[in-house]
Amino acid sequence: MTDSILKCTTRHIRIFTARCENNDLVQDSEHLTLDLDPDNEFIWEELVIGKVHKRFSELVDSYSGKDLSDYNLRKIGSDLEGTIRQLLQAGELKYNPDCRVLNYSMGLPRTKDLL
């Protein structure tokens, strides 16, 4: 294992091989930290956050016993991006109209008018 923090950064997901202590990341190869939607592009309800965390746990468990590599972290991050997209398309997640930049990165909102 490496002495530096491995990370995966996607548009809405950041995963680090670190733990958070006093708002700082401390390298820990036995721990993964998930930073969900750091730009606050979406409005998150606890139930939806729970679904993303559950999927994250499932993905991490599926890599149990395998090398923790940049590639595997990117695969987990990409899968979580897909989960976010599914939640958005199902109407369980909504864009945050107060977001700094509202760019509809996961596609236009689905409304009855647009369907």
From Swiss-Prot:
The keyword Coiled coil does not apply. It holds the Pfam family NdhM. Keywords: Membrane, NAD, NADP, Plastoquinone, Quinone, Thylakoid, Translocase, Transport. It is found in: Cellular thylakoid membrane. The keyword Hydrolase does not apply. Belongs to the complex I NdhM subunit family. InterPro entries: NdhM (IPR018922). Its EC number is 7.1.1.-. This is NAD(P)H-quinone oxidoreductase subunit M. NDH-1 shuttles electrons from an unknown electron donor, via FMN and iron-sulfur (Fe-S) centers, to quinones in the respiratory and/or the photosynthetic chain. The immediate electron acceptor for the enzyme in this species is believed to be plastoquinone. Couples the redox reaction to proton translocation, and thus conserves the redox energy in a proton gradient. Cyanobacterial NDH-1 also plays a role in inorganic carbon-concentration. GO terms for cellular component: plasma membrane-derived thylakoid membrane. It is a peripheral membrane protein. NDH-1 can be composed of about 15 different subunits; different subcomplexes with different compositions have been identified which probably have different functions. GO terms for molecular function: oxidoreductase activity, acting on NAD(P)H, quinone or similar compound as acceptor; quinone binding. It catalyses: a plastoquinone + NADH + (n+1) H(+)(in) = a plastoquinol + NAD(+) + n H(+)(out); a plastoquinone + NADPH + (n+1) H(+)(in) = a plastoquinol + NADP(+) + n H(+)(out). Its main location: membrane. HAMAP family: NDH1_NDH1M.
